[in-house]
UniProtKB/Swiss-Prot annotation:
Cofactor: pyruvate
Annotated source species: Herminiimonas arsenicoxydans
Active site: 88, 145, 248
Site positions per UniProt: Cleavage (non-hydrolytic): 247-248
Highest classification ranks of the organism: Bacteria, Pseudomonadati, Pseudomonadota, Betaproteobacteria, Burkholderiales
Assigned keywords, A-Z: Cell membrane, Decarboxylase, Lipid biosynthesis, Lipid metabolism, Lyase, Membrane, Phospholipid biosynthesis, Phospholipid metabolism, Pyruvate, Zymogen
Post-translational modification: Is synthesized initially as an inactive proenzyme. Formation of the active enzyme involves a self-maturation process in which the active site pyruvoyl group is generated from an internal serine residue via an autocatalytic post-translational modification. Two non-identical subunits are generated from the proenzyme in this reaction, and the pyruvate is formed at the N-terminus of the alpha chain, which is derived from the carboxyl end of the proenzyme.
Protein name listed in UniProt: Phosphatidylserine decarboxylase proenzyme
Length: 294
């Protein structure tokens, strides 16, 4: 069966209207109705509330409060390695960026330039670099943290479609992650620039960052950009940088010769915030080779 057949209904659905409606429902403070919705969601998706800082579902005034719940202290210890996984989820793909193309799924790649909103100069910094795409399912923790230390330089809001971003849709919708609404966060790290892209989806009510709040509140169809290079906004490895109000996908971009993903990082593997994601290239270069370079 064609990979496109299962996703054909998504082309017909009024995705924006559904997303706006879902956002209103998720933000409503409806007492017992809200608690009932939360209880149903936990049962439907198998959410582990023992990991939550506040496991009492009756204390959440809205579904959004529940969905963006904090984890209890110690639930996600951070690995000592230079790069950690920034979210709970499952690896969609990871690998090398080749000729401005990022692998999406069998038969599909998309443009790095398109992903970052058409900025050729920004995209060029990641030629032959590394990428990782992590999908956050409904059951997952939906706050996004820093994979390494970084100084925020820019943020770009790119309007777009609102297709689902689950694995079935990734196999069936071309250019999915460069097609959907997204927020591009550009950082400067110890090894150079890196990017975290928060990709929206059907019924993702909003995307927030810790320094700005809700980024896509208006959805007026225009690319918007913020510059932070004149101020110092530094975030530490493991520090929260954003969150999804109803889940989605994070795409990470790193420059050439910056890092090497751990061998265990393969497509469809479940991952958790704080686990080791990658080593710096210098850290894994054999001593003899290091001597030759110097």
């Amino acid at each position: 069966m064609s990979n496109r057949l299962p996703v054909l209904p998504q082309y017909l659905l009024p995705k924006k209207a559904l997303t706006i409606f879902a956002g209103k429902v998720a933000g409503a403070k409806a007492g017992r109705v809200t608690t009932g919705l939360i209880r149903w969601f936990i049962g439907k998706y198998g959410v582990n509330m023992t990991e939550a800082a506040n496991p009492d579902i009756r204390s959440y005034a809205s579904f959004n409060e529940f969905f963006t719940r904090a984890l209890r202290s110690g639930a996600r210890p951070l690995a000592d390695d230079p790069y950690i996984c920034p979210v709970d989820g499952a690896i969609s793909q990871c690998g090398t960026i080749q000729k401005d193309q990022i692998f999406q799924a069998k038969g599909h790649s998309y443009s790095t330039t398109a992903l970052v909103g058409g900025d050729h100069e920004l995209a060029a910094q990641f030629d032959n670099g590394s990428f990782a795409t992590v999908y956050l399912s409904p059951r997952d923790y939906h706050r996004i943290h820093m994979p390494c230390d970084g100084r925020l330089m820019r943020m770009i809001y790119v309007p777009g479609a609102l297709f689902s971003v689950n694995p079935t849709t990734a196999r069936g919708v071309p250019n999915l992650f460069a097609r959907n609404e997204r927020v591009v966060c550009v950082f400067e790290g110890a090894a150079g620039p890196f990017v975290l892209v928060l990709v929206g989806a059907t019924i993702v009510g909003s995307m927030q960052t810790t320094w700005h709040g809700v980024v896509n509140a208006t959805r007026n169809g225009n690319i918007r950009e913020w510059h932070y290079d004149k101020q110092y906004l530094g975030l530490k490895k493991g520090e929260e940088m954003g969150r999804f109000l109803l889940g989605s996908t994070v795409v990470m971009l790193f420059p050439h010769d910056t890092l090497s993903f751990n061998p265990s990082w393969t497509a469809e593997r479940p991952v958790r915030l704080g686990e080791s994601m990658a080593q710096t290239v210098a850290a894994i270069t054999p001593p003899a080779m290091q001597a030759d370079v110097s």
